[in-house]
């Protein structure tokens, strides 16, 4: 179903995207292959806007002339253009090409005529420096000419907004793949996104109309938002989906805002800034949150702002605790939780660190405790390694839900989908594996059935496991076990009648929350240290989620006899080979 989106009625998405990408033929030499997108992406945006505005071009110019002395004229011009953007320049692509001697000056004049929302996009693309490179290499005229040809036509009479969105998405994918790992940091492939959307929407009642809000706190090029919107409309096309996103990288923000404009959405919902230190959606609440924030990245740049907000307690986003400064991914989880509506649901990608890093009482453990004790942790899905373009490590989808169905209350589902993939024919960066449609259906089935089970695929080696746990399973009490200082007579030294602890003999034990601490102490400690006691003032509660331990499968080692026999066989084969070799030499 996902792939069908690239075969729309009236226009073949991949074919059109290929035709546009082939404009790169004019860039060979002055631009390296991984730089083609620096020209093609902004030019695609500009040409789409140009072709949309062309029918109302004269009307906009007339309205501009009559209203240009007004303090505020945006409303008049957007009404005249019929879009949320406009252009007041007298130039079109045709008239630009009619004057090749002044192509740079006229093209810059044309770009300066765009409305402020488009100007913001071009500034974030840093397109001015790209124009200079094209001028210096005598390619600007050729590029404009190529985009003004039939293959570069992007008017709404031939290409619907949704189709143009998919064309642009395909171009973004090509750019990301050609750029390798750096761009991959901002691009999550569709197979992963579709799994996340299917999990988010698995229990959704979308039979009625209305409005649904979707938020991505680290949206990159906004592919997660567009895929989520697509999935919701597949279930009910009458639902109005409003997308919101924030991004800190200028070029990927430009792509995201362009995509929103191209699709006919509200570009004001795409906002620039650092989510951790410059929250652009303070006070907002969303039905769905889907995100792949950076992991393993420090938050030193945001430290001052984050700690100041943490000091506000429940008035801020980071009251439960702060992770170590070297890894800020849990801060994004807290940001998402603060923006989840009472019936909200979130799917967010993390690496393995948030599962277990930090001792009892530490920031990471307190964040896990906050999530689990509020019964918001719905499921964690382990993906295969080599799923992303820029990292080969294991990754996990955390599913959080503030409105769990009754049968999921007080429970957490762990799904090991690390064997649920198929190898790609050709890797892209470090992405060597794909979640196929069938694999995605298996994981969605496991999530929906909510039981201890193993689901097997049609091909050998493809399966996913599901296990259900009580919330308390992941909690423990960390107790401090003391033993006394012994005097020369072998008896404990006393102070005010109490034995004094020997710091050299001090130890700790993690007692599962489901166990009685005193019973554990009697069973596990006193038989080996009868003079020990618990310093109950130092007891702390911690939480960890040891996925590997829960899904560990014991492999019976090969019998020693079989190993020895195999060695003897190999030795005999080597001896025979040597005899044949030297026998021929004689």
Model-derived regions: residue spans:
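Short acidic (Asp/Glu) and glycine-rich catalytic loops that position anionic groups and cofactors
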Residues: 266-270, 311-316, 345-354, 418-424, ...
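Conserved catalytic motifs of ABC-family nucleotide-binding domains
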Residues: 298, 302-326
């Amino acid at each position: 179903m996902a792939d069908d989106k690239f075969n729309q009625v009236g226009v073949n998405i991949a074919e059109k995207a290929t035709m546009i990408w082939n404009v790169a033929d004019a860039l060979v030499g002055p631009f390296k292959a991984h730089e083609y997108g620096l020209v093609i992406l902004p030019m695609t945006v500009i040409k789409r806007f140009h072709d949309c505005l062309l029918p109302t071009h004269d009307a906009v110019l007339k309205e501009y002339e009559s209203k240009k002395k007004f303090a505020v004229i945006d409303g008049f011009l957007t009404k005249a253009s019929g879009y949320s953007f406009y252009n007041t320049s007298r130039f079109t692509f045709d008239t630009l090409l009619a004057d090749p001697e002044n192509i740079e000056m006229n093209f810059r004049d044309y770009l300066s005529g765009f409305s402020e929302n488009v100007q913001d996009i071009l500034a974030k693309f840093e397109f001015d420096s790209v124009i200079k490179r094209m001028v210096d290499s005598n390619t600007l005229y050729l590029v404009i000419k190529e985009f003004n040809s039939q293959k570069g036509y992007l008017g709404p009479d031939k290409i619907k907004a949704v189709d143009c969105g998919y064309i642009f998405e395909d171009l973004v994918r090509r750019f990301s793949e050609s750029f390798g790992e750096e761009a991959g940091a901002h691009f999550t492939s569709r197979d992963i996104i579709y799994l996340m959307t299917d999990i988010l929407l698995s229990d959704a009642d979308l039979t009625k109309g209305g409005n649904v809000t979707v938020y991505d706190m680290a949206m990159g090029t906004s592919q997660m938002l567009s895929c989520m919107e697509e999935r919701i409309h597949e279930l009910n096309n009458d639902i109005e989906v409003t997308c919101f996103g924030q991004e800190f990288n200028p070029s990927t923000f430009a792509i995201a805002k362009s995509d929103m404009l191209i699709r006919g959405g509200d570009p004001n919902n795409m906002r620039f800034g650092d989510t951790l230190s410059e929250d652009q959606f303070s006070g907002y609440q969303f039905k769905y949150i889907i995100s792949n924030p950076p992991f393993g990245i420090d938050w030193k740049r945001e430290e001052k702002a984050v700690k100041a907000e943490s000091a506000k307690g429940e008035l801020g986003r980071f009251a439960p605790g702060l992770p170590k400064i070297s890894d800020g991914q849990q801060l994004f989880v807290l940001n998402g939780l603060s923006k989840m509506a009472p019936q909200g649901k979130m799917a967010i990608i993390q690496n393995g660190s948030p599962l277990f890093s930090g001792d009892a009482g530490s920031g990471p453990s307190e964040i896990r405790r906050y999530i689990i004790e509020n019964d918001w942790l719905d499921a964690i899905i382990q993906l295969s390694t080599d799923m992303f373009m820029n990292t080969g490590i294991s990754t996990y989808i955390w599913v959080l839900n503030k409105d769990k169905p009754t049968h999921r209350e007080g429970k957490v589902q762990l799904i090991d989908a690390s064997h649920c993939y198929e190898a790609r024919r050709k890797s892209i960066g470090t992405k060597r594996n794909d979640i196929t449609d069938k694999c995605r259906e298996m994981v969605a089935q496991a999530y929906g059935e909510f039981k201890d089970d193993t689901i097997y695929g049609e091909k050998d080696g493809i399966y996913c496991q599901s296990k259900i746990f009580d919330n308390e399973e992941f909690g423990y009490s960390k107790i401090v076990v003391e033993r006394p200082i012994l005097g020369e007579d072998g008896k404990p030294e006393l102070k005010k009648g109490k034995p004094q602890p020997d710091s050299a003999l001090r130890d700790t034990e993690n007692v599962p929350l489901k166990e009685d601490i005193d019973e554990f102490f009697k069973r596990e400690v006193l038989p080996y240290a009868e003079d020990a006691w618990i310093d109950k003032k130092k007891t702390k509660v911690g939480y960890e989620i040891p996925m590997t331990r829960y899904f560990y499968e014991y492999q019976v080692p090969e019998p020693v006899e079989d190993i020895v026999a195999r060695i003897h066989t190999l030795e005999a084969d080597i001896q025979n080979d040597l005899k044949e070799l030297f026998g021929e030499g004689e």
